Protein backbone atom coordinates (compact mmCIF):
# COMPACT_ATOMS: atom_id res chain seq x y z
CA UNK A 1 0.00 0.00 0.00
CA UNK A 2 1.23 3.53 -0.83
CA UNK A 3 2.38 5.67 2.11
CA UNK A 4 0.16 8.54 3.33
CA UNK A 5 2.27 11.04 1.34
CA UNK A 6 0.90 9.57 -1.88
CA UNK A 7 -2.59 10.26 -0.64
CA UNK A 8 -1.71 13.89 0.17
CA UNK A 9 -0.26 14.45 -3.32
CA UNK A 10 -3.35 12.95 -4.89
CA UNK A 11 -5.63 15.20 -2.85
CA UNK A 12 -3.82 18.29 -4.13
CA UNK A 13 -4.73 17.53 -7.74
CA UNK A 14 -7.92 15.45 -7.43
CA UNK A 15 -11.09 15.47 -5.45
CA UNK A 16 -11.02 13.86 -2.03
CA UNK A 17 -13.09 10.90 -3.23
CA UNK A 18 -10.81 10.30 -6.26
CA UNK A 19 -7.73 10.58 -4.08
CA UNK A 20 -8.77 7.83 -1.74
CA UNK A 21 -9.73 5.62 -4.68
CA UNK A 22 -6.27 6.16 -6.22
CA UNK A 23 -4.56 5.50 -2.91
CA UNK A 24 -6.37 2.23 -2.46
CA UNK A 25 -5.88 0.82 -5.98
CA UNK A 26 -3.13 -1.55 -4.90
CA UNK A 27 -5.17 -2.91 -1.99
CA UNK A 28 -8.12 -5.29 -2.06
CA UNK A 29 -11.24 -3.87 -3.76
CA UNK A 30 -13.63 -2.22 -1.31
CA UNK A 31 -17.35 -3.02 -1.47
CA UNK A 32 -19.54 -0.23 -2.89
CA UNK A 33 -20.99 2.08 -0.30
CA UNK A 34 -24.78 1.81 0.13
CA UNK A 35 -26.68 4.67 -1.44
CA UNK A 36 -27.92 7.23 1.05
CA UNK A 37 -31.70 7.38 1.40
CA UNK A 38 -33.25 10.14 -0.70
CA UNK A 39 -34.58 13.10 1.30
CA UNK A 40 -37.21 15.65 0.26
CA UNK A 41 -36.27 19.03 1.75
CA UNK A 42 -38.55 22.01 2.39
CA UNK A 43 -37.47 25.00 0.28
CA UNK A 44 -39.04 27.69 2.49
CA UNK A 45 -36.56 30.01 4.26
CA UNK A 46 -35.76 29.23 7.90
CA UNK A 47 -37.38 25.81 7.63
CA UNK A 48 -35.18 22.71 7.95
CA UNK A 49 -37.92 20.09 7.60
CA UNK A 50 -37.08 17.11 5.40
CA UNK A 51 -38.93 13.90 4.65
CA UNK A 52 -38.35 10.46 3.18
CA UNK A 53 -41.53 10.58 1.07
CA UNK A 54 -42.61 13.17 -1.48
CA UNK A 55 -46.23 13.18 -0.28
CA UNK A 56 -45.06 14.03 3.23
CA UNK A 57 -43.25 17.09 1.89
CA UNK A 58 -46.35 18.10 -0.11
CA UNK A 59 -48.46 17.90 3.05
CA UNK A 60 -45.86 19.94 4.96
CA UNK A 61 -45.74 22.67 2.30
CA UNK A 62 -49.48 23.20 2.76
CA UNK A 63 -48.71 24.44 6.27
CA UNK A 64 -46.64 27.25 4.75
CA UNK A 65 -49.07 28.14 1.95
CA UNK A 66 -52.35 27.52 3.81
CA UNK A 67 -53.56 25.51 0.82
CA UNK A 68 -55.94 22.57 1.31
CA UNK A 69 -56.22 20.97 -2.11
CA UNK A 70 -58.60 18.11 -1.31
CA UNK A 71 -62.15 19.50 -1.05
CA UNK A 72 -65.30 17.56 -0.12
CA UNK A 73 -67.81 17.91 -2.96
CA UNK A 74 -70.84 16.80 -0.95
CA UNK A 75 -73.57 19.44 -1.26
CA UNK A 76 -73.45 21.99 1.53
CA UNK A 77 -70.15 20.72 2.98
CA UNK A 78 -67.10 22.26 1.31
CA UNK A 79 -64.59 21.12 3.95
CA UNK A 80 -61.01 20.88 2.65
CA UNK A 81 -58.01 18.83 3.69
CA UNK A 82 -54.25 18.69 3.23
CA UNK A 83 -54.14 14.97 2.33
CA UNK A 84 -56.39 12.82 0.17
CA UNK A 85 -56.45 10.24 2.96
CA UNK A 86 -58.02 12.80 5.29
CA UNK A 87 -60.67 13.57 2.64
CA UNK A 88 -61.44 9.86 2.16
CA UNK A 89 -61.81 9.48 5.92
CA UNK A 90 -64.08 12.54 6.09
CA UNK A 91 -66.36 11.28 3.29
CA UNK A 92 -67.21 8.27 5.46
CA UNK A 93 -69.01 10.70 7.80
CA UNK A 94 -71.41 11.48 4.93
CA UNK A 95 -71.92 7.90 3.82
CA UNK A 96 -72.09 6.47 7.35
CA UNK A 97 -69.86 3.61 6.25
CA UNK A 98 -67.74 1.90 8.93
CA UNK A 99 -65.66 -0.72 7.11
CA UNK A 100 -63.28 -1.65 9.95
CA UNK A 101 -64.75 -4.23 12.34
CA UNK A 102 -63.19 -5.25 15.66
CA UNK A 103 -62.08 -8.89 15.52
CA UNK A 104 -62.01 -9.42 19.30
CA UNK A 105 -64.22 -12.20 20.60
CA UNK A 106 -67.65 -10.88 21.57
CA UNK A 107 -67.00 -7.37 20.23
CA UNK A 108 -68.78 -6.17 17.11
CA UNK A 109 -67.89 -2.48 17.16
CA UNK A 110 -67.20 -0.84 13.79
CA UNK A 111 -65.03 2.15 12.90
CA UNK A 112 -64.60 4.43 9.90
CA UNK A 113 -60.79 4.39 10.02
CA UNK A 114 -58.14 1.77 10.65
CA UNK A 115 -56.41 4.00 13.20
CA UNK A 116 -59.60 4.31 15.27
CA UNK A 117 -59.98 0.54 15.22
CA UNK A 118 -56.37 0.16 16.39
CA UNK A 119 -56.87 2.64 19.24
CA UNK A 120 -60.05 0.86 20.30
CA UNK A 121 -58.36 -2.54 20.27
CA UNK A 122 -55.38 -1.35 22.31
CA UNK A 123 -57.54 0.48 24.81
CA UNK A 124 -60.32 -2.09 25.28
CA UNK A 125 -58.72 -5.46 24.59
CA UNK A 126 -54.92 -5.22 25.00
CA UNK A 127 -54.33 -2.73 27.79
CA UNK A 128 -57.26 -3.45 30.06
CA UNK A 129 -54.98 -3.76 33.09
CA UNK A 130 -52.64 -0.88 32.18
CA UNK A 131 -53.23 2.18 34.32
CA UNK A 132 -51.43 5.51 34.61
CA UNK A 133 -51.20 6.42 38.30
CA UNK A 134 -50.80 9.94 39.65
CA UNK A 135 -47.56 10.09 41.64
CA UNK A 136 -48.51 13.08 43.79
CA UNK A 137 -48.81 12.42 47.50
CA UNK A 138 -52.25 11.35 48.77
CA UNK A 139 -53.69 11.25 45.22
CA UNK A 140 -53.04 7.92 43.47
CA UNK A 141 -55.77 8.52 40.88
CA UNK A 142 -55.56 6.25 37.85
CA UNK A 143 -56.17 6.98 34.17
CA UNK A 144 -56.40 4.88 31.04
CA UNK A 145 -54.48 7.39 28.93
CA UNK A 146 -51.16 9.09 29.63
CA UNK A 147 -52.45 12.42 28.35
CA UNK A 148 -55.37 12.23 30.80
CA UNK A 149 -52.83 11.81 33.60
CA UNK A 150 -50.79 14.82 32.40
CA UNK A 151 -53.89 17.00 32.24
CA UNK A 152 -54.90 15.86 35.74
CA UNK A 153 -51.49 16.66 37.20
CA UNK A 154 -51.92 20.30 36.18
CA UNK A 155 -54.39 20.52 39.07
CA UNK A 156 -51.51 19.76 41.43
CA UNK A 157 -48.91 22.03 39.82
CA UNK A 158 -51.26 24.88 38.81
CA UNK A 159 -49.25 25.16 35.58
CA UNK A 160 -50.81 25.18 32.12
CA UNK A 161 -49.96 22.05 30.20
CA UNK A 162 -50.24 23.40 26.64
CA UNK A 163 -49.33 27.07 26.43
CA UNK A 164 -49.39 29.32 23.36
CA UNK A 165 -45.84 30.49 22.59
CA UNK A 166 -46.96 33.51 20.53
CA UNK A 167 -45.48 36.69 21.99
CA UNK A 168 -48.03 38.60 24.03
CA UNK A 169 -50.60 35.79 24.08
CA UNK A 170 -49.96 33.39 26.96
CA UNK A 171 -53.23 31.46 26.62
CA UNK A 172 -53.16 27.85 27.71
CA UNK A 173 -55.23 24.85 26.75
CA UNK A 174 -56.12 21.42 28.10
CA UNK A 175 -55.13 19.50 24.96
CA UNK A 176 -52.65 19.86 22.07
CA UNK A 177 -55.45 19.80 19.50
CA UNK A 178 -57.09 22.87 21.07
CA UNK A 179 -53.73 24.65 21.17
CA UNK A 180 -53.13 23.84 17.50
CA UNK A 181 -56.57 25.18 16.57
CA UNK A 182 -55.88 28.35 18.55
CA UNK A 183 -52.50 28.87 16.82
CA UNK A 184 -54.29 29.49 13.53
CA UNK A 185 -55.76 32.65 15.05
CA UNK A 186 -52.20 34.07 15.03
CA UNK A 187 -51.03 32.61 11.73
CA UNK A 188 -54.23 33.01 9.71
CA UNK A 189 -55.10 31.78 6.21
CA UNK A 190 -53.91 33.99 3.37
CA UNK A 191 -56.11 34.40 0.31
CA UNK A 192 -54.35 33.07 -2.79
CA UNK A 193 -56.57 34.97 -5.26
CA UNK A 194 -54.40 38.06 -5.45
CA UNK A 195 -55.82 40.05 -2.52
CA UNK A 196 -54.46 40.78 0.96
CA UNK A 197 -57.27 39.14 2.94
CA UNK A 198 -56.16 36.92 5.84
CA UNK A 199 -58.80 34.70 7.47
CA UNK A 200 -58.72 33.41 11.02
CA UNK A 201 -60.20 30.04 10.02
CA UNK A 202 -60.22 27.92 6.86
CA UNK A 203 -64.02 28.14 6.74
CA UNK A 204 -63.82 31.94 6.85
CA UNK A 205 -61.36 31.87 3.94
CA UNK A 206 -63.68 29.65 1.88
CA UNK A 207 -66.55 32.04 2.59
CA UNK A 208 -64.40 34.99 1.48
CA UNK A 209 -63.43 33.26 -1.79
CA UNK A 210 -67.06 32.35 -2.54
CA UNK A 211 -68.33 35.88 -1.95
CA UNK A 212 -65.43 37.99 -3.26
CA UNK A 213 -63.89 35.88 -6.01
CA UNK A 214 -66.97 34.36 -7.58
CA UNK A 215 -66.26 31.98 -10.44
CA UNK A 216 -69.24 31.50 -12.71
CA UNK A 217 -69.83 27.95 -13.96
CA UNK A 218 -70.91 27.90 -17.59
CA UNK A 219 -73.41 25.58 -19.27
CA UNK A 220 -71.78 24.47 -22.52
CA UNK A 221 -75.18 23.98 -24.19
CA UNK A 222 -77.01 27.26 -23.62
CA UNK A 223 -74.16 29.41 -22.14
CA UNK A 224 -76.15 30.09 -18.97
CA UNK A 225 -74.01 30.63 -15.87
CA UNK A 226 -74.37 29.26 -12.34
CA UNK A 227 -72.69 29.87 -9.00
CA UNK A 228 -72.44 26.23 -7.95
CA UNK A 229 -71.81 22.90 -9.64
CA UNK A 230 -74.95 21.32 -8.18
CA UNK A 231 -77.06 24.12 -9.72
CA UNK A 232 -75.52 23.35 -13.11
CA UNK A 233 -76.11 19.63 -12.60
CA UNK A 234 -79.80 20.27 -11.91
CA UNK A 235 -80.01 22.60 -14.92
CA UNK A 236 -78.46 20.03 -17.28
CA UNK A 237 -81.55 17.86 -16.84
CA UNK A 238 -83.42 20.36 -19.02
CA UNK A 239 -81.06 19.55 -21.91
CA UNK A 240 -81.17 15.76 -21.50
CA UNK A 241 -82.80 13.90 -24.42
CA UNK A 242 -84.55 11.67 -21.90
CA UNK A 243 -85.57 12.82 -18.44
CA UNK A 244 -88.01 11.94 -15.69
CA UNK A 245 -90.86 14.41 -15.27
CA UNK A 246 -93.93 14.73 -13.04
CA UNK A 247 -97.29 15.19 -14.80
CA UNK A 248 -100.11 17.18 -13.25
CA UNK A 249 -102.81 14.77 -12.01
CA UNK A 250 -105.68 17.23 -12.51
CA UNK A 251 -108.11 16.22 -15.24
CA UNK A 252 -107.56 17.88 -18.59
CA UNK A 253 -104.29 19.58 -17.62
CA UNK A 254 -101.34 17.45 -18.74
CA UNK A 255 -98.63 19.95 -17.74
CA UNK A 256 -95.29 18.36 -16.82
CA UNK A 257 -92.48 19.50 -14.50
CA UNK A 258 -88.97 18.29 -13.72
CA UNK A 259 -89.34 18.72 -9.93
CA UNK A 260 -92.09 17.95 -7.43
CA UNK A 261 -91.68 21.48 -6.02
CA UNK A 262 -92.60 23.07 -9.35
CA UNK A 263 -95.55 20.71 -9.76
CA UNK A 264 -96.83 21.57 -6.28
CA UNK A 265 -96.48 25.27 -7.05
CA UNK A 266 -98.43 24.81 -10.30
CA UNK A 267 -101.31 22.99 -8.59
CA UNK A 268 -101.61 25.54 -5.79
CA UNK A 269 -101.39 28.65 -7.96
CA UNK A 270 -103.21 27.50 -11.12
CA UNK A 271 -105.77 24.92 -10.00
CA UNK A 272 -106.35 25.95 -6.38
CA UNK A 273 -105.75 29.67 -7.06
CA UNK A 274 -103.96 29.79 -3.73
CA UNK A 275 -101.16 32.37 -3.65
CA UNK A 276 -101.00 33.43 0.00
CA UNK A 277 -97.43 34.79 0.02
CA UNK A 278 -97.36 38.47 -1.01
CA UNK A 279 -94.28 40.57 -1.73
CA UNK A 280 -94.36 43.54 0.65
CA UNK A 281 -91.89 45.64 -1.32
CA UNK A 282 -93.35 49.05 -2.21
CA UNK A 283 -95.04 49.01 -5.60
CA UNK A 284 -94.65 45.27 -6.19
CA UNK A 285 -97.44 43.20 -4.63
CA UNK A 286 -96.64 39.98 -6.51
CA UNK A 287 -98.14 36.84 -5.00
CA UNK A 288 -96.71 33.32 -4.77
CA UNK A 289 -98.00 29.87 -3.93
CA UNK A 290 -94.81 28.80 -2.13
CA UNK A 291 -92.87 30.67 0.54
CA UNK A 292 -89.56 29.63 -1.04
CA UNK A 293 -90.64 31.32 -4.28
CA UNK A 294 -91.28 34.58 -2.42
CA UNK A 295 -87.87 34.31 -0.74
CA UNK A 296 -86.12 33.90 -4.10
CA UNK A 297 -88.14 36.78 -5.58
CA UNK A 298 -87.13 39.13 -2.74
CA UNK A 299 -83.55 39.14 -4.05
CA UNK A 300 -84.79 41.05 -7.12
CA UNK A 301 -85.50 44.07 -4.91
CA UNK A 302 -82.40 43.66 -2.75
CA UNK A 303 -79.50 42.04 -4.71
CA UNK A 304 -77.21 42.19 -1.68
CA UNK A 305 -79.63 40.12 0.35
CA UNK A 306 -78.46 36.54 0.59
CA UNK A 307 -80.86 33.80 -0.28
CA UNK A 308 -82.18 32.19 2.88
CA UNK A 309 -81.34 28.57 3.46
CA UNK A 310 -84.36 26.37 3.99
CA UNK A 311 -84.63 25.28 7.59
CA UNK A 312 -85.68 21.77 8.50
CA UNK A 313 -89.13 22.04 10.02
CA UNK A 314 -90.27 20.06 13.02
CA UNK A 315 -91.78 16.71 12.20
CA UNK A 316 -95.51 16.68 11.63
CA UNK A 317 -98.10 14.23 10.42
CA UNK A 318 -96.86 12.69 7.18
CA UNK A 319 -98.82 13.05 3.97
CA UNK A 320 -98.20 11.10 0.85
CA UNK A 321 -96.99 12.66 -2.39
CA UNK A 322 -100.43 12.05 -3.89
CA UNK A 323 -102.22 14.05 -1.19
CA UNK A 324 -99.86 16.99 -1.73
CA UNK A 325 -100.38 17.01 -5.47
CA UNK A 326 -104.12 16.34 -5.48
CA UNK A 327 -105.02 18.79 -2.73
CA UNK A 328 -106.66 16.02 -0.67
CA UNK A 329 -105.95 16.28 3.07
CA UNK A 330 -106.85 13.15 5.06
CA UNK A 331 -108.85 13.85 8.25
CA UNK A 332 -106.91 13.80 11.52
CA UNK A 333 -107.47 10.84 13.82
CA UNK A 334 -107.41 10.94 17.59
CA UNK A 335 -104.62 9.02 19.25
CA UNK A 336 -105.52 5.37 19.64
CA UNK A 337 -108.47 5.59 17.24
CA UNK A 338 -108.51 2.88 14.62
CA UNK A 339 -108.97 3.43 10.91
CA UNK A 340 -112.60 3.84 9.87
CA UNK A 341 -113.53 2.08 6.67
CA UNK A 342 -115.15 3.62 3.63
CA UNK A 343 -118.53 2.39 2.51
CA UNK A 344 -116.88 0.01 0.10
CA UNK A 345 -114.70 -1.41 2.90
CA UNK A 346 -111.60 0.61 2.01
CA UNK A 347 -109.72 2.87 4.40
CA UNK A 348 -109.55 6.65 3.79
CA UNK A 349 -105.91 6.17 2.75
CA UNK A 350 -107.17 4.35 -0.32
CA UNK A 351 -108.11 7.75 -1.79
CA UNK A 352 -104.45 8.77 -1.64
CA UNK A 353 -103.34 5.46 -3.11
CA UNK A 354 -105.63 5.96 -6.09
CA UNK A 355 -104.40 9.51 -6.54
CA UNK A 356 -100.80 8.31 -6.58
CA UNK A 357 -101.45 6.40 -9.78
CA UNK A 358 -102.29 9.68 -11.53
CA UNK A 359 -98.91 11.24 -10.73
CA UNK A 360 -97.11 9.88 -13.75
CA UNK A 361 -93.38 9.80 -14.28
CA UNK A 362 -92.79 10.20 -18.00
CA UNK A 363 -89.78 9.80 -20.22
CA UNK A 364 -89.53 12.50 -22.85
CA UNK A 365 -88.00 11.42 -26.12
Swiss-Prot record:
Keywords: DNA-binding, Metal-binding, Nucleus, Repeat, Ribosome biogenesis, RNA-binding, Transcription, Transcription regulation, Zinc, Zinc-finger
Subcellular location: Nucleus
GO cellular component entries: nucleoplasm; nucleus
An individual GO BP term: rRNA transcription
Function: Involved in ribosomal large subunit biogenesis. Binds the approximately 50 base pairs internal control region (ICR) of 5S ribosomal RNA genes. It is required for their RNA polymerase III-dependent transcription and may also maintain the transcription of other genes. Also binds the transcribed 5S RNA's.
Family annotation (PANTHER family): TRANSCRIPTION FACTOR IIIA (PTHR46179:SF1), ZINC FINGER PROTEIN (PTHR46179)
Official protein name in the record: Transcription factor IIIA
Amino acid sequence: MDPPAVVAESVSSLTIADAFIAAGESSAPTPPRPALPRRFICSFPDCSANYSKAWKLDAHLCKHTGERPFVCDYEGCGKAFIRDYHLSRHILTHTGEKPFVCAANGCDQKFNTKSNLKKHFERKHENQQKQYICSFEDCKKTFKKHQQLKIHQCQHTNEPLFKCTQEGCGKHFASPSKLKRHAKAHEGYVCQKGCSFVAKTWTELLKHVRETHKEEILCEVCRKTFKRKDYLKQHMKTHAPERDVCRCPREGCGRTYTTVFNLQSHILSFHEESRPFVCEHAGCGKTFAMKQSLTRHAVVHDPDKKKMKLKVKKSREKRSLASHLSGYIPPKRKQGQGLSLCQNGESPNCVEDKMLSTVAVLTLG
